[in-house]
Amino acid sequence: MANSMNGRNPGGRGGNPRKGRILGIIDAIQDAVGPPKQAAADRRTVEKTWKLMDKVVRLCQNPKLQLKNSPPYILDILPDTYQHLRLILSKYDDNQKLAQLSENEYFKIYIDSLMKKSKRAIRLFKEGKERMYEEQSQDRRNLTKLSLIFSHMLAEIKAIFPNGQFQGDNFRITKADAAEFWRKFFGDKTIVPWKVFRQCLHEVHQISSGLEAMALKSTIDLTCNDYISVFEFDIFTRLFQPWGSILRNWNFLAVTHPGYMAFLTYDEVKARLQKYSTKPGSYIFRLSCTRLGQWAIGYVTGDGNILQTIPHNKPLFQALIDGSREGFYLYPDGRSYNPDLTGLCEPTPHDHIKVTQEQYELYCEMGSTFQLCKICAENDKDVKIEPCGHLMCTSCLTAWQESDGQGCPFCRCEIKGTEPIIVDPFDPRDEGSRCCSIIDPFSIPMLDLDDDDDREESLMMNRLASVRKCTDRQNSPVTSPGSSPLAQRRKPQPDPLQIPHLSLPPVPPRLDLIQKGIVRSPCGSPTGSPKSSPCMVRKQDKPLPAPPPPLRDPPPPPERPPPIPPDSRLSRHFHHGESVPSRDQPMPLEAWCPRDAFGTNQVMGCRILGDGSPKPGVTANSNLNGRHSRMGSDQVLMRKHRRHDLPSEGAKVFSNGHLAPEEYDVPPRLSPPPPVTALLPSIKCTGPIANCLSEKTRDTVEEDDDEYKIPSSHPVSLNSQPSHCHNVKPPVRSCDNGHCILNGTHGTPSEMKKSNIPDLGIYLKGEDAFDALPPSLPPPPPPARHSLIEHSKPPGSSSRPSSGQDLFLLPSDPFFDPASGQVPLPPARRAPGDGVKSNRASQDYDQLPSSSDGSQAPARPPKPRPRRTAPEIHHRKPHGPEAALENVDAKIAKLMGEGYAFEEVKRALEIAQNNLEVARSILREFAFPPPVSPRLNL
C-alpha cells in the first residue's frame, strides 16, 4: 500500500523490475532511519525545482498521452503550484526575508519533496516509454497517483502559506481534541518527522504493530515525504473522526472495508463501478481530491447510472449506515458482504455549552434564548460548525448545504467539520444569591420551577429591584460578546460574577413564536436581525472605524410631552419619578449598537430596536414555564400587545425586511459608524407621520393595545424630510454609560414581552427567517447597511417566500440601493474580509464568553415604552445650542475621565462629529471599556 501511494513502480509492470525493488529497499531504509536533514531552500533551489516542474508539464502535454481534463489534472496543478511559489517569493523579496524563508523548516521540506516528485515523474516517462500512452497500464496509473500527490501538495502549500504568507504555526486544526493533541506534543510546529509523530500518537492511541504503522503512514502522509504536517494531520482527523476512536474508525473504514479505494480519482471510480452497472447498490468510497478532508462515495443507482456524492455533516460510517438503510450503499466494490459499521456509532459525549448569566439575561431582554437557532428560530442549536464555531440546528445547516451554500452560513468560513453540541440552559438557582437572575421562559422546561414558586417570586423581585437601580449603573448590560463558544471540556465555565457584560452573546429573534402569534417573548421584539443586532462586534478586538463623511448636526429635539397622569398602564412604565413614556426615548447606542451598531445605518437601527424591542434592564418575567409571572398582569400583557407594531416596523426597516436573527450569528461588520446626523435623515419621516408624532407620544398610555404602530402606508423615507422632523437628535440616556433608562423611563419586563410580535410575524416570516442564511453571492461591503431605518417598508413589501424550503433562496440584489431601499441579506453580505477583521469575528456569535472582569452580571435597566415616531425618540437630548456649542476639549476630558485613551476619544468624537453620546457609544463598542462598577447582590 505504501508503495502504491508513493507512486513507486511496484516492480512487476515497470521498465526495470530489479531497479524498482532496489529503490523500494532504499526507501524502506530511509523510512526506518528517518528523513535526512534538508538543505536551505534558497531562490536558486526553488528555480531549479521550477525547471523540473516545467519539464514534467511538457512531457504531460504530449498529445499521445490524451490526459483528461478532470481532477487531478496535472497540467493545471503544476502551473498553479508554480504561481503560488512565485507569490510566496514575492512576499519574501528582500534578502533578510528570503533568508528567513529559506530556513523555514516546512518550506525546505516542501521544496525538497517537490523536486523529488518532479524527478520521479520524469523518470516515469523515461522508464515507461510507450506504456505511458496506454490508459490502462500500470505506468499510467503511477502517473495518476503522482498527479494526486501534486494535488495534495498544492492544497497543503496554499493552507500553510495563504496569500503567500507563512501561517503554519497558526494553522487551525478542525477537531478540538486533535488540536489539543498536536499542541501538547508538537506545540506550534508545522511539520514533524513520521517517526516522531508515530511515537507521540502511540502514547494516545496504541498502534498494534509495525505493519499497522506502515498502513497508517500511507493514509496520513498524503504528500508522501516521510513527514506529517499539521495540514495532513487535520485532514486525517476529519476523515476518520471522532478523535477518541480514530484508529478504530480507520481500521474499519480504510484497512478492512472492501469499499475503500486509496488514491483513486473521479474517473477511476466511474470506471471501476462500470462493471457493476447492473448491480444497483454497488459502491466504493475514496478521499475527495478536490475537497480534502471529505469523502466521496460513488454508487450505482437503480437505473444503472453511476453517481458520486460527498456526505455533509456526518462521519463516513454514519453516511454509509444511512445509505445502506436507504438502499443506496449495499455492495462494497460489488461484493455481497456489506460490513456492519453500527459498532462505530457508540454515542460520543457532546460538547456542552453552558449559558452564562450575562448571556441568559441578554437573551431574555431580547425575547429569546441562547439555545434557539438564529436561522429558523424554531429549533434549538444542536450542531457546531468547525473550525469557526458558529452554532445552529442541523436542519438549517443541511438545508443550507443542499442549496449549494458555500461555507458557514454566517461567516463563509470553510466548513471543515461539524460537532454535535448541547446547550445547557442557565439555571438561576445554580447562581445562588450572588446575582439577579431572570427566568428564561424558553428554557423553563429544563428548569422546572413548578415546585419552587417561592424561588420564582424571589427572582422576580430581585429582577425588579435591579431594574430600579439601573440608573446608577455605569455600563449597559447589552454589550457584545467577548469570545467564541467553548465547550465545557475545552474551557472551564467562568464565574458568572467574573464575566464582563462585554462578552454577552448576540440575540436571536423568536420567529417561531411570532409566526404563530404566541406571546412568549419575555421582553418583546425579536426585531434584531443579525444585520442590525446591537451585540455583534467584538469590542476589544475591533479597531475604531474610519470616520464617515461629515453631515450636518441634527437640530434639537422637540420638547418632551407633558407628563401623563399615572394609571395602571402608566405605572408599569414608570419605576421612578423622572420617568416618561419610554417610547419617546430610544435605546442608548451603547446598549443597542454594541460593536456592530455603527455600520452606517446601524445606530439608527439600534434606536428603533431599542424602542420597540426588549431593552437591557428588562428581563423575562412575563412567561415562566409557560405561565405569566407574578410581576405581570393582564393589563401588562395588553400593554405588550400594543408594542408589537413599531418594533416590527423597525425590524423590517432594519434591512429591508431582514431582521436581527441574521446578525446574531454573523461575524461582526467593521463598517465605520456614521455620525448621528448620518442616521437622522434615515429616520426622518413624511409629513403625515411627523405631524402626528408628538400627539401619538402623548397618547401612548391611553391608547388601545393593538393601536401602536407606525402606519405602513407612510414609509419612512430619506427623501421626505420636513422641517419639523429635523428635530430628531440622537437618543439621550439618563445614564451616559449606555443604560436603558431613556428619559428616565422604565418599562416593565412584561410590557416589552410582546411588543413586536404582530408586525414581526409579517417580516420575519416573509423575509428574515430565510435571509439568515446568506447567499453564496459575494457579500457587499459593510456600508451596505445604510438603510437600517432609511426605508420603512409596508408589511406586505417582502418579496421572499416564507416557506421553510425557501430559507436559502438568494436575493436578486446583494447590494444596498439607497434609492430603492434595498438592503443586502444579512448574514453574509459583507466584504470577504469583514468577517475576519476582528480576532474572534468568525466565531463570536452564539458562543460562550471566555473572558471575565470580576464584575457581577450588570443590573438590567428598565424597559422604556416604545417610541411612536422617529422625531420624538430623542426627548431628553440637550437642546440644539447647548449641545452644538459644547466645548470639544471638555468632551474629550469627560470621556478620558471615563477611562478611555486620548487617541480613541479624539477619533470617536471625530466620527461622531463631536456628539458626546455617540462618541461614548463608539468607545464602548470599539475601545476597551472603563471598569464596571459591581452590581448589588439582591
Curated annotation (Swiss-Prot):
Listed Low complexity bias regions: 794-804
SMART domains according to UniProt: RING (SM00184), UBA (SM00165)
Top-level enzyme category: transferase
One annotated Gene Ontology cellular component of this protein: plasma membrane
Cellular localisation: Cytoplasm
GO biological processes: CD4-positive, alpha-beta T cell proliferation; cellular response to hydrogen peroxide; immune response; intracellular signal transduction; negative regulation of apoptotic process; negative regulation of CD4-positive, alpha-beta T cell proliferation; negative regulation of epidermal growth factor receptor signaling pathway; negative regulation of T cell receptor signaling pathway
Compositional bias per record (Pro residues), positions renumbered to this chain: 544-566, 775-784
Reaction(s) this enzyme catalyzes, per UniProt: S-ubiquitinyl-[E2 ubiquitin-conjugating enzyme]-L-cysteine + [acceptor protein]-L-lysine = [E2 ubiquitin-conjugating enzyme]-L-cysteine + N(6)-ubiquitinyl-[acceptor protein]-L-lysine
Region annotation (SH2-like) ranges: 241-343
One Gene Ontology molecular-function label: receptor tyrosine kinase binding
Region span, Disordered: 465-588, 702-725, 771-885
Disease link: Lack of Cblb expression is the cause of the Komeda diabetes-prone (KDP) phenotype, characterized by autoimmune destruction of pancreatic beta cells and rapid onset of overt diabetes with no sex difference and no significant T-cell lymphopenia. The KPD rat is a spontaneous animal model for human type 1 diabetes mellitus.
Protein name, entry field: E3 ubiquitin-protein ligase CBL-B
Organism: Rattus norvegicus (Rat)
